[in-house]
Amino acid sequence: MIAKSSNKPTKVKRTWGHYKVLYEGKGFKVKELVINPKSSLSNQKHKHRSETWNIVKGECFVLINNEHIQLTIDKGIFISVNTWHKGINNSDKPAHIIEIWRGDILTEDDIERAKLIM
């Protein structure tokens, strides 16, 4: 297996914080997510990939199929394909997450966001 890596990963800014792709190869991608204090990701699911999240600094909640699970340092969670999930950082410090994607199609557009009902 030949994996792609760069000397300095590119930071991609989002409204909730940022991410960097650290390493990728056939069937997997490793990213660092940083969720800003008092911020959250959208409620989302993916058709072509599973994800594993491990907290390496800070803490956050993960909403999985309407169940809140608290993640702290060295705690992780597996998110299977087609599972609704949302990362929520209610703390005053950034939450750093190592996210591992596994699947056949590993693109940013493999995402379905829950529609907000007002």
Question: Which residue ranges define each predicted feature?
Answer:
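Double-stranded beta-helix
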Residues: 2-14, 86-118
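Glycine- and acidic-residue-biased ligand/ion/polar-headgroup-sensing regions
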Residues: 48-61, 65-66
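A generic "binding-loop/recognition-motif" signal
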Residues: 39, 48-49, 67, 83-84, ...
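Short beta-strand His + acidic residue motifs that chelate non-heme Fe in jelly-roll/DSBH
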Residues: 42-44, 62-63, 79, 85-92, ...
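Short acidic-glycine-tyrosine-enriched beta hairpin
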Residues: 66-84
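A short glycine-rich, His/Asp/Glu-containing loop-to-beta-strand
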Residues: 7-45, 49
